């Protein structure tokens, strides 16, 4: 992995009681040792693989102002990180879920792009076996489950300040307002809505195939084609490019997909991140609620599975063997 650390700082927030988070600040930067580089590379890998929300700094963002001064050489990185940790402590203290942790600030370069990554990492306990085959306690940073993380694409921010996607962050687990306090700390507002872009793409594809007067099988083939392209981009860590997708769909209609999307006003960006859960709707129907979970291939609708919107009834012809076996055993037992 071609990742180079420029500067990295680590501080700590300790929760002493329900009202107080104590600051423990380092007086020097971390040295980019092999272990430190390996840790940052793992955090970069884990973060890059997760679904993220996009944002941009507000004009009043204190973090953006001090970061800009740091980038201009008017403040050193350690002082910037210490002051930012203090502001993070003030925001975290407003929320009852504040648990503290290790606060990491890392300025690094990956594939010619500069990033600033900010994360709050938890320290977990575990066990290890030493060279004498004794079992001893140990501690480790829980990188895989880190959900208080934000990353600023410094290259994008400085070369394209009007962008709505240079800042990304994780929204956290359900029921925790991680995004709320992190947005306050960053002084940011939500930018590009990747999920909305993906939903718009799905609607545009459906309308595109309808206007081309394709039959059911042809329309599903186009959806599968779109899904294959988008999934390949997702797996490669690349964004969906409308021009590239339009080339994939050449021949579907006399009008190109990019021209169709622009004329119909779907407001799709030239490129945007793929959203896995939204894209699945191209090839599958899925839903759950009231003790019922249903998931089936889209091509089965109208063939083995039929929906009556008037009565909201779903009819399935031919159940899966394992389900049929369970049903037969249950009904034959009289339960």
Swiss-Prot record:
GO terms for molecular function: double-stranded DNA binding; identical protein binding; single-stranded RNA binding. InterPro entries: Nucleoid_associated_NdpA. Keywords: Cytoplasm. GO terms for cellular component: bacterial nucleoid; cytoplasm. NCBIfam families: PRK00378.1. PANTHER family: NUCLEOID-ASSOCIATED PROTEIN YEJK (PTHR38772:SF1), PTHR38772. HAMAP family: NdpA. Belongs to the YejK family. This is Nucleoid-associated protein YejK. It comes from Escherichia coli (strain K12).
């Amino acid at each position: 992995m071609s990742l180079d650390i420029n500067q990295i700082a680590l501080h700590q927030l300790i929760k002493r009681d329900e009202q107080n988070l104590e600051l423990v600040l380092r007086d020097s930067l971390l040295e980019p040792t092999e272990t430190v580089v390996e840790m940052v590379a793992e955090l970069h890998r884990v973060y890059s693989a997760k679904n993220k929300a996009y944002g941009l700094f507000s004009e009043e963002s204190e973090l953006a102002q001090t970061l800009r001064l740091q980038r201009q050489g008017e403040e050193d990185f350690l002082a910037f990180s210490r002051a930012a940790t203090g502001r993070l402590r003030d925001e975290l203290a407003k929320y009852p879920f504040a648990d503290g942790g290790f606060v990491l600030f890392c300025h690094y370069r990956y594939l010619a792009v500069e990033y600033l990554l900010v994360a709050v990492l938890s320290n977990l306990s575990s066990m290890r076996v030493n060279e004498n085959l004794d079992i001893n306690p140990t501690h480790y940073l829980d990188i895989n489950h880190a959900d208080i993380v934000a990353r600023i694409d410094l290259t994008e921010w400085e070369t394209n300040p009007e962008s709505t996607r240079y800042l990304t962050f994780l929204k956290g687990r359900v029921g925790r307002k991680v995004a709320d306090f992190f947005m306050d700390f960053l002084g940011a507002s939500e930018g590009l809505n990747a999920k909305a872009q993906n939903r718009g793409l799905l609607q545009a594809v459906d309308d595109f195939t309808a206007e081309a007067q394709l039959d059911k099988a042809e329309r599903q083939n186009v959806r599968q084609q779109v899904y294959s392209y988008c999934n390949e981009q997702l797996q490669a860590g690349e964004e969906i490019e409308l021009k590239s997708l339009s080339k994939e769909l050449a021949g579907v209609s006399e009008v190109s997909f990019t021209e169709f999307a622009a004329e119909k006003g779907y407001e799709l960006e030239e490129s945007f991140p793929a959203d896995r859960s939204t894209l699945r709707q191209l090839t599958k129907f899925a839903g759950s609620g009231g003790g019922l979970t249903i998931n089936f291939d889209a091509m089965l609708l109208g063939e083995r599975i039929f929906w009556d919107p008037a009565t909201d009834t779903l009819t399935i012809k031919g159940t899966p063997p394992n389900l049929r076996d369970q049903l037969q055993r249950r009904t034959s037992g009289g339960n």
